[in-house]
A protein has these predicted regions:
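Exposed, low-structure sequence patches enriched in small/polar residues
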Residues: 7-9, 15-18, 22, 28-196
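A conserved hydrophobic secondary-structure block that centers on an alpha-helix together
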Residues: 1-5
Length: 196
């Protein structure tokens, strides 16, 4: 950089297919950062033992993503562990947030028939997120029902419970969201939709 400082990022990615129905996705990254001395940030805020000011500090960070998925005819499941340390930096801009550890689980089933309801999909997922101080910043449960019919009407019903969410230091209480959508498309050139 013109004002001094430098950064490096090393990442190892992998996708492993296990048997016929499973896949394991792995991403491991490590960053090394040395800040420049052009301090255009007028702040005294800190992250860990470091400042946000451009004052020549050196630090390293890490990021991990491990996801195991199973997909078979009519069913899918998965679990994911992801963490990004507070000092992780990605100069290519692929990581917009750091300082979190997240666990996610999901499962879905699809039923197909030759009747009026051609396809019905039921999906459920759970997400927990903590920061590196082990404070809960998000807990989310989502259920969704998708329906496709033989008379060109499709529908989605989604219910989301955010049991806990923290944003900029403020803890929000439990929030429930309901989404309802219908779509009628009798031809490729006409579609009528409703969302709530």
């Amino acid at each position: 950089y013109h004002s001094g400082g430098n950064g490096s990022l090393v990442e190892l990615d992998g996708l492993i297919n296990i048997l016929q129905d499973y896949s394991l996705e792995l991403n491991f990254a490590r960053s090394q950062t040395e800040e420049g001395y052009l301090n255009f940030l007028d702040t005294t805020d800190t992250f860990g033992s470091h400042t946000y000011q451009m004052d020549g500090e050196k630090f390293s960070g890490r990021a991990h993503n491990i996801r195991l998925r199973r997909v078979v005819e009519g069913s899918y499941s998965g679990l994911r562990h992801k963490d990004v340390s507070p000092t992780y930096r990605s100069n290519v801009g692929l990581v917009g947030k750091n300082n979190y550890k997240e666990r996610s689980y999901w499962h879905g089933r699809t039923f197909r028939t030759d009747g009026a309801f051609r396809k019905i999909t039921i999906h459920a997922s759970k997400q927990n997120r903590l920061n590196f101080q082990d404070q809960k910043t998000r807990e989310r449960l989502e259920t969704r029902l998708n329906i496709e019919t033989s008379f060109n009407i499709n529908g989605v019903f989604e219910f989301v419970t955010k049991a806990s969410e923290k944003f900029e230091g403020k803890q929000f209480s439990k929030q429930d969201e309901i989404k309802l959508a219908f779509e009628y498309s009798p031809s490729e050139t006409f579609m009528l939709g409703f969302r709530y």
